[in-house]
Amino acid sequence: MRWRLNLSSNQIVLAFSVFALAVFNSHYWQYMAAHAPFGEGHNWLLWLTMPFFLLACLNFLIQLTFWPYVHKVWIPLLLVLGAGASYAVMTQNIYFNADMIQNIIQTNPGEAKSWLAPRFVGWVLLTGVLPAALYLWLVRVRYAKRWYQEIGWRLASMAASVLVVALVAATAYGNYASFFRNNKGINHQITPVNFIGASIKTAYNVYDANRPLVQIGLDAKRTSAQGERKKVFILVVGETTRAENWGLNGYARQTTPQLAALGSEVINFPQVSSCGTATAISVPCLFSRMNRGDYNGNRAAHEEGLMDILQRADIYTSWRENDGGCKGACDRIKHVNVHDWAPKNECVSEGCWDIHLLTGLQREIDAMPGDGVIVLHTIGSHGPSYYQRYPQAFRKFTPTCDTNQIQQCDRQALINTYDNTVLYADHVLAETIKLLQNDTQVDSALWYFSDHGESLGEKGMYLHGAPYMIAPSQQTHIPMVFWASPGFYQHSGLNQTCLRDHAGQQTYSHD
């Protein structure tokens, strides 16, 4: 081809950095405008230096990875991934840290499909695929005549970046320290630095994870007396339900009418926090012996958890799945998936209506050789396709947001749709309790809690997965309820009145 852009490596890296800051980071600049307005205090200095500061940082980072031949793959890849990441940040206010990368890696095809909306595809094609194609087609790198000259020019560019950062630190350190301290986690929204750094950390975690399974609780054993009635404990792990919209917690709407109708039989815990803000963190955390402060995903993946110990103690264990996987918590026990028996017209790729978790549950309880713990992992209020989580009969609050492009919906319609998912979760829990009430041959109990909460547009944030230190309460404050049959209370020595008093007065968490 006759006409091509002959650019030096420094020019290409600088051009890419400018493009990324201008196109992929519009959300970041809008955030700055809202939280550090130009006319307030010394924010003018922040605005004057921030573009140069970020440009220098990105230039330095890309210089480290821009090498002959490699750049033909690396730059187009950064453009396409940057386009996808920037769309998530712009439309869903997503924070890309190692936990989010892990969450993406563990996303099943059904969840991924829900993101393939026309606007997403269009944005990636326009700002990622097209520039990548033009780069491959039109740009030719003009290297220096001598290898040491090329390295010298590259080092000079990196030195200039370091100098810019040093000058900014010398003149505006206080402004930067204040801005980033008051807006913790915003660095996870600067593209492509966010997903590059998070991917490096994730890769390190994967490397660090190569170790054998550690057994714990080797002395675990049952202590039931001979002739005691069989007990079953149903553990319902919810998905994305937040305490703020939970009727039993005093929400303005009655989103839990069926549980409320059970009166004092149901014990509600109004102050409960999750271990994480994403399923990939919360589920393995709550079944491990670690608490939130010292939780390590690699350690959890290579150490036995609660279900392993129960199984070793000769307690029947089973996991019924409707949310894309147990994240390792059920790997070594019996586990089944609701997709195997639920009607296809009552399922989407991410999951089925949660009521189908009860199919065959009574038969399973009857067949237990002794005491048992059965986990029901629900899809609950999983977004962004909230409207697909419940049957038409539970479309009580209208109008609804019947799309996965939730940021385009009227906020009240979005809340209506979400509240309908909570209403359906209430129904599923009530039906599970009814099943247990009807079985007079077994002492039974049910314990429900959500894995984490959800943002519904508060402060422009949607979905979940925010870094815990800056996560809003909507993502960490979760509902929790407990129910037990009279026989369970009697034979387990559990004091219902005492439990209810503690539930209303104390704070609890997954760990």
Predicted features, each with a name:
Residues W3, Q11-V13, F24-V124, V129-D511:
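Catalytic domains that recognize anionic headgroups
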Residues S17-A20:
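Membrane-embedded alpha-helical bundles of multi-pass transporters
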